Amino acid sequence: MHHIHKLDHPSGTAITLAEGLLAQRPDMQGWVLTDLTTPSGITEHLADAPQQALPIASIRRGEVPGIHSIEWDSDADSITITHSAHSRAGFALGAVMAAEWLPRNPGFRTMTEFMDFLFSNA
């Protein structure tokens, strides 16, 4: 879920999370944007996800900076992991940290390399 001013859907973070999950699940093949909830609260069903695809729903509501949830569901139970950004300050801090890291690591760099650096120094 993101604020109503965000134009892309699904968000880059949602795509990154989906690709991370798919990398661990060779039995799954890609992701599909299944539902889009507009700022007016209307949910549009865009597509059915094939059984081997990861479904993504995108919601735009109010001024929410960002909420991402991953849900596993079975007949027996459900597990949900959620990250909620309370403000945009965390996004700004991440951008500043990346900007400080880049001069010490010249060349073409990926976000994965930056995240590896962050987690190795945590």
Annotate each predicted stretch with a short phrase.
Residues M1-A122:
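C-terminal substrate-binding/catalytic lobe of Rossmann-fold NAD(P)-dependent oxidoreductases
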